[in-house]
């Protein structure tokens, strides 16, 4: 049976917040296909709890947000990427509001801002303690209504294709419903496949987060950066059942981490105590667990009050009760789990990789924002900012790209084309190479 071939302007592989932001930001004149591997669109974005970090108060400033990001990332971040993405944060929040995302507000109608570890100010906009779910619930119907967008589920991306100019021009897929191999040809291919956390035994990620996007790009020689930096979230519920992440904001609002004797131990490790960045808190918890020969520590939020817990943390309260724990009355057993890949496919600030025709956005990409350790709530922000930036770049380059593969090319193609050795890819940006060379040796211990 001959292989099926279809053609689209933009092929987006991954249906999380990054892919959705791109799809909804493309002009109506461009035909796009949104590919996901599950039976329904599912991603780590729906599991994100905290929110988006953005400077929205008079007490805050972009410079403070930049400094917090650089400190959390052990100064391994790319300074230009940090400044550009964080400066775009208020516009990203406004875009979500225009998309009818129900962000929490104060009684006087202002956006409610919470604080999380590593942040010096309150700057996290959120939807209770299930921000990612609320965002995607608002965006998915809009994706379905976009007439220029074709959504395909149950499809696995197998290999990227390139034309005679070396430009990525399509992808080979396997449709799990029809059991057929197909080729989707595209003028622009965008990887938005998420991270690799489910490679670890204990992870907050969905089962699909196995690093397939990085593998696809690596196989054709795309530059990869900082894969060694995998963030562990400090506070995952330690009970029987699937890993459940307890939002950073529980500590941001004043929650305490306790040892076996009910004593706060974080002040022994860092002056910021529970508000230290995630890598510091995770290492401190691991050290405390080893010292006490225990599999977890305690998280105490009882003093926040039942009203605060019910209003701002309903999901955590509900899940605790479902597992026989009451956050209003009990210490909660918590332990770290693999959470976020800070590295990935190296890109510029429009999502372009080192391989023409291929872009990457979201957790699969490495813009240089996160450095050796991501600052809380900078990831959903990056998804929106980079999704919109990639859409703008694709629209701007529409008339200039090389010709894509055509269905007729299929009959003469025998194997994927590789661009040199994938072990020595060309860098996407020279300044990042300098960053890598200067910082690799100094930062290997920043995210154990």
What are the functions of these language-model segments?
Residues 40, 216, 222-327, 393:
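An anion/pyrophosphate-binding glycine-rich loop and adjacent beta-alpha core
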Residues 99-181, 185, 192, 233-238, ...:
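Conserved redox-cofactor binding core of oxidoreductases
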Residues 188-244, 378-386:
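Glycine-rich loop(s) and the adjacent beta-strand/alpha-helix scaffold that form part
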Residues 79-90, 123-141, 152, 203-211, ...:
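Short beta-strand to alpha-helix junction loop
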Residues 38-70, 74, 231, 241-247:
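Conserved N-terminal glycine-rich FAD pyrophosphate-binding loop of Rossmann-like flavoproteins
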Residues 153, 158-169, 174, 312-365:
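A glycine-rich dinucleotide-binding beta-alpha-beta segment and adjacent secondary-structure elements
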Residues 10-34:
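N-terminal Rossmann-like FAD-binding beta1-loop-alpha1 element of flavoenzymes
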């Amino acid at each position: 049976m001959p292989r099926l071939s279809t053609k689209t302007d933009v092929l987006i592989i991954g249906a999380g917040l990054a892919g959705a932001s791109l799809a909804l930001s493309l002009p109506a004149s461009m035909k796009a296909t949104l590919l996901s591997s599950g039976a329904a669109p599912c991603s780590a974005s729906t599991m994100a709890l905290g929110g988006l970090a953005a400077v929205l108060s008079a007490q805050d400033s972009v410079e403070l947000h930049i400094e917090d990001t650089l400190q959390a990332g052990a100064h391994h971040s790319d300074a230009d990427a940090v400044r550009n993405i964080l400066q775009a944060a208020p516009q990203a929040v406004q875009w979500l509001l225009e998309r009818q995302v129900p962000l929490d507000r104060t009684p006087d109608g202002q956006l409610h801002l919470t604080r999380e570890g590593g942040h010096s100010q309150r700057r996290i906009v959120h939807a209770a303690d299930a921000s990612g779910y609320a965002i995607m619930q608002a965006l998915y119907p809009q994706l379905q209504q976009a007439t220029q967008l074709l959504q395909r589920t149950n499809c696995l991306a197998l290999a990227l294709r390139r034309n005679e100019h070396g430009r990525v021009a399509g992808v080979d897929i396997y449709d799990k419903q029809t059991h057929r191999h197909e080729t989707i040809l595209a003028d622009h291919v965008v990887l938005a496949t998420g991270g690799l956390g489910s490679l670890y035994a204990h992870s907050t990620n969905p089962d699909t987060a196995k690093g397939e996007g990085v593998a696809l790009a690596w196989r054709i020689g795309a530059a990869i950066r900082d894969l060694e930096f995998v963030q562990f979230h400090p506070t995952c519920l330690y009970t029987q059942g699937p890993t459940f992440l307890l939002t950073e904001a529980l500590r941001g609002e004043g929650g305490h981490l306790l040892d076996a004797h009910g004593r706060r131990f974080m002040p022994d490790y860092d002056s910021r105590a529970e508000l230290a960045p995630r890598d510091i808190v995770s290492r401190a918890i691991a050290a405390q667990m080893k010292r006490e020969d225990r599999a977890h520590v305690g998280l105490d939020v009882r003093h926040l009050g039942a009203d605060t817990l019910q209003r701002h943390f309903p999901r955590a309260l509900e899940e605790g009760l479902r597992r026989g724990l009451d956050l209003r009355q009990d210490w909660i057993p918590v332990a770290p789990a693999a959470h976020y890949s800070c590295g990935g496919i190296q890109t510029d600030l429009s999502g372009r990789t080192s391989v023409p025709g291929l872009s990457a956005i979201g957790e699969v990409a490495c813009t240089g924002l996160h450095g050796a350790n991501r600052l809380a709530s900078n990831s959903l922000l990056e998804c929106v900012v980079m999704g919109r930036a990639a859409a703008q770049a694709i629209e701007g380059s529409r008339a200039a790209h090389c010709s894509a593969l055509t269905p007729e090319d299929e009959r003469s193609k025998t194997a994927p084309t590789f661009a040199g050795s994938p072990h020595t890819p060309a860098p996407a940006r020279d300044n990042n190479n300098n960053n890598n060379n200067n910082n690799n040796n100094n930062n290997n211990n920043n995210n154990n």
